[in-house]
A protein has these predicted regions:
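A short beta-strand-loop-alpha-helix capping motif that often carries His-Thr
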Residues: 88, 122-129, 142
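Charged helix-capping and loop-helix junction motifs
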Residues: 70, 139-145
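Short glycine-rich anion-binding loops that position phosphate/pyrophosphate groups of nucleotides
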Residues: 58-61, 130-134
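Surface-exposed, charge/polar-rich loops and edge strands
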Residues: 1-9, 13-16, 20-27, 111, ...
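N-terminal active-site beta-alpha-beta segment that forms phosphate/nucleotide-binding
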Residues: 2-120
Length: 192
């Protein structure tokens, strides 16, 4: 049974709290956590079959998926990262060392010179987040970019973050899209 909405935390307050907790992790600890998450991901039976990954370029204290995508690219997996165009995410081919642009708020994205990758062709989305609920609810930054994307595609939605980003449930809205799994230094959790 879901708790009454009166007992659920406010999304804005929860975003602030989870960002502060994530920011409190030292760069060395974040790096160690990412390396441990990579070990867990390598054990996932679907990992070796992934052909195209939709990833992201990390911002500030976000989980840095570069180690995950590097190991995938070494075995021939294509990596794409999003550019924001007209309030929508459009994925572009990306390799370490490619040119990037800095957007509003310091967020990095591939340049428009890189090849477009259709979102429908992506079979695994490594998804940034502030929080992940116990049932796969994703707490993002409030822009709805990933909710709009996930309403249109069928690829596996894997939230990537740190264990401290697992949160108590909050009130979700009709447009909120759930994750299929969550990866952290503690392991891989799949949601039904």
């Amino acid at each position: 049974m879901k708790p009454s909405t009166d007992a659920l935390p406010d999304k804005r307050a929860l975003r602030r709290q989870l960002r502060a907790e994530r920011d409190s992790l030292s760069p060395a600890l974040r790096h160690a956590h990412v390396q441990q998450a990579n070990v867990h991901l390598a054990r996932w039976e679907r990992w070796s079959a992934v052909k195209v990954i939709g990833s992201y370029l990390p911002h500030e204290s976000e989980f840095d998926p570069t180690a995950l995508t590097r190991s995938a690219r070494e075995r021939g997996t294509r990596i794409a990262c999003p550019r924001v165009i007209d309030k929508a995410l459009h994925f572009h081919d990306w390799q370490e060392g490619d040119a990037v642009e800095v957007t509003i708020g310091g967020v990095l994205q591939p340049t428009n010179a890189s090849e477009i990758v259709r979102a429908e062709d992506i079979d695994l989305f490594l998804t940034p987040l502030l929080g992940c609920g116990q049932d796969g609810a994703r707490l993002g930054y409030g822009g709805g970019f990933y909710d709009r994307l996930f309403a249109e595609v069928t690829g596996f939605r894997l939230g990537v973050g740190f264990a401290l980003q697992r949160a108590a449930d909050w009130e979700t809205e009709a447009h909120d899209q759930r994750l299929h799994g969550f990866l952290s230094e503690e392991g891989l959790t799949l949601f039904s």
